[in-house]
């Protein structure tokens, strides 16, 4: 029997070092991981055997067995699943480049509970064996192949792979040589309790040998939890299934267990977590909803089973209408799967709308966790945008609480027909923005958008239920006309523009190409000035984001709006009427101040500093 000694992949070494020197209190998770892996191996073979029945010839009843040998200090876990050949053993146990190990290491928080769950989420669960074992021996024979291979390691940097001539049927056997200090895991009663706690939802029967090692006792019902009636399932069973499936430490916030018996037959058991998932916005995040066909696991990768914006969902979907021998490629553009996806989306959004109305405080917590992802759907062409907007909530500047668009509309002032918003990074800064002072002074609410995605979806959704959605930075906002559209008001507005032409022309001449236009503001009440953009122009924050991403080269010139009721602007205007045009420095300072308030760069910081110093000096002398 030839042996081949190999070094672990560098990233595996880091994981092993973490496991071997683990201080985690919940070391029993090694059993959860090994049972889960064994179940997956059986699921894979069950799927492959649909198109090649010879793979399971003579042994089509899948099972997992667990045995304790106290005398040898061993725990043995055996399955008759897909098995592994030499290449599989090296790829799956010697390297884990596919498992996102670097991301796993970065995500470690030092919180033992959270870190324990990360082990499974990143696919490095096998290595948790080294928390309790000082040597691990894996014997395996791949379905459809004759050769038996053994993988063995003490976890200290190297492993051995060898071919074996021992009699061994299809599947995998893992022998854990338990550390002396962890020998409590050899206690028959304790291990049986651990296995049972992690096996109730597993669809493969799990057998536990008695202390004599002769008789097998089945520990689980081996029926998929989602196939049972809701009345037969306890809340604790739902929780345990959720935690095992998603490697979570929280309880599910919402559980959706439904059987669809219409034109398309399928069962869904879906969960919405109560805590934010660590990889929600990670580029190589995994989907956490598994597709089954007639209780046979098919895939949880590269299938369009749920929309991306609902990626926080956890659970399973089991279809009766898809053929078992369907290829993963065929699932990409499958009409049945598309109908299932639409039905699930409708069901989830319906449940969210119900929760929003019945439990607003709970919903606020959900929104803080997953609202950013949910709003991504508003940028997708295939989304029912109105249905999705119905479950969105935003911070109200007027009431300082989260409200829906429907609640905003219900609070319209007489004659108001527009939904106003202001976007930025910090809600407190937005509240003090001059852009909204006039609207708020008239008790006209403004929604505060602080997620980056907000700047994208408002470009796709310009209205909601017939009401325009408009940024408060737009030049055409007139707080006096927002609630009244009389011709008399329009005439007054035109008269105001003409009256202050001397003022606006002076600002434009002084600032030149720094501004596109200078206008008299219809929305400022106390601030001297603010930047604004026309309806056709890009929102200020959106433009800044695209510049940061190097999508556009430079910022465009903005409009400058002046408040003629402000004392500073009034002084400049009076000076102009007296033919005094010596306020260029003050004009530039007002413009720089408006830029700073919008987060825009000041054109010349040195000149700005000098102007500011000169004005302060004049004030104190």
Curated annotation (Swiss-Prot):
Spans annotated as A: 1-328
Chain segments carrying region C: 545-621
An MF annotation (GO) of this entry: ATP-dependent protein folding chaperone
UniProt KW Repeat keyword: no
Keyword Aminoacyl-tRNA synthetase: no
Record SUPFAM superfamilies: ATPase domain of HSP90 chaperone/DNA topoisomerase II/histidine kinase, HSP90 C-terminal domain, Ribosomal protein S5 domain 2-like
Reported function: Molecular chaperone. Has ATPase activity.
Protein name from the UniProt record: Chaperone protein HtpG
Annotated source species: Rickettsia felis (strain ATCC VR-1525 / URRWXCal2) (Rickettsia azadi)
Taxonomic classification: Bacteria, Pseudomonadati, Pseudomonadota, Alphaproteobacteria, Rickettsiales
Gene designation: htpG
């Amino acid at each position: 029997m030839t042996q081949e000694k190999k070094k672990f992949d560098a990233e595996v070494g880091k994981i092993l070092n973490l496991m071997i020197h683990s201080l985690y209190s919940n070391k029993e998770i090694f059993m959860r991981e090994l049972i889960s892996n064994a179940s997956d191996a059986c699921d894979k073979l069950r799927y492959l055997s649909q198109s090649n029945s010879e793979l399971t010839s003579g042994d089509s009843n899948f099972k997992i067995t667990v045995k304790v040998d106290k005398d040898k200090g061993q725990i043995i876990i055996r399955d008759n699943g897909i098995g592994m050949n030499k290449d599989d053993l090296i790829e799956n146990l010697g390297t884990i480049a596919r498992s996102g190990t670097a991301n796993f290491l970065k995500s470690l928080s030092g919180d033992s509970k959270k870190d324990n769950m990360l082990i499974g989420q990143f696919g490095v669960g096998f290595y948790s064996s080294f928390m309790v074992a000082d040597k691990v021996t894996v014997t395996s024979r791949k379905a459809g192949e004759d050769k038996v291979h053994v993988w063995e390691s003490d976890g200290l940097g190297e492993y051995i792979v060898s071919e074996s001539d021992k009699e061994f049927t299809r599947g995998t056997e893992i022998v854990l040589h338990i550390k002396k200090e962890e020998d409590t895991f050899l206690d028959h009663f304790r291990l049986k309790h651990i296995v049972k706690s992690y096996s109730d939802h597993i669809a493969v029967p799990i057998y536990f040998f008695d202390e004599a090692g002769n008789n097998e006792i089945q520990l689980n019902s081996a029926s998929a939890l989602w196939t049972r009636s809701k009345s037969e399932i306890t809340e604790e069973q739902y929780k345990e299934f959720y935690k095992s499936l998603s490697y979570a430490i929280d309880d599910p916030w919402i559980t959706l267990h439904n059987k669809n018996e219409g034109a398309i037959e399928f069962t869904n058991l879906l969960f919405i977590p109560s805590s934010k998932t660590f990889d929600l916005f990670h580029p190589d995040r995994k989907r956490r909803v598994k597709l089954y066909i007639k209780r046979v696991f098919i895939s949880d990768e590269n299938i369009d089973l749920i929309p991306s914006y609902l990626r926080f969902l956890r659970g399973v979907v089991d279809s009766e209408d898809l053929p078992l021998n369907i290829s993963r490629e065929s699932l990409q553009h499958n009409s049945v799967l598309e109908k299932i996806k639409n039905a699930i989306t409708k069901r989830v959004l319906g449940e969210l709308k119900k929760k929003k109305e019945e439990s607003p405080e709970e919903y606020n917590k959900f929104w803080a966790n997953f609202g950013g992802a949910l709003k991504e759907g508003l940028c997708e062409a295939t989304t029912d945008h109105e249905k999705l907007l119905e479950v969105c909530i935003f911070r109200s500047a007027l009431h300082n609480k989260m409200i829906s668009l429907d609640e905003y509309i219900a609070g319209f002032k007489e004659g108001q027909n527009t939904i106003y918003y202001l976007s930025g990074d910090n809600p407190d800064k937005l509240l003090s923005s001059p852009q909204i002072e006039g609207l708020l002074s008239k008790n006209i609410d403004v929604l505060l958008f602080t997620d980056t995605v907000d700047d994208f979806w408002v470009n796709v959704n310009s209205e909601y239920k017939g009401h325009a959605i408009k940024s408060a930075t737009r030049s055409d906002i007139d707080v006096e006309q927002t609630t009244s559209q009389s011709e008399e008001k329009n005439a007054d507005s035109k008269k105001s523009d003409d009256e202050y032409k001397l003022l606006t022309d002076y600002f434009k001449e002084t600032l030149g190409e720094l501004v596109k236009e200078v206008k008299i503001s219809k929305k400022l009440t106390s601030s001297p000035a603010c930047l604004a953009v026309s309806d056709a122009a890009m929102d200020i924050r959106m433009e800044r984001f695209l510049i940061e991403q190097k999508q556009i080269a430079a910022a465009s010139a903005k409009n400058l709006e002046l408040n003629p009721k402000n004392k500073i602007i009034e002084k400049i205007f009076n000076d102009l009427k007296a033919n005094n045009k010596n306020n260029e420095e003050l004009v530039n300072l007002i413009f720089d101040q408006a830029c700073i308030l919008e987060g825009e760069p000041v054109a010349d910081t040195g000149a700005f500093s000098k102007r500011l110093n000169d004005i302060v000096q004049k004030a104190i002398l």
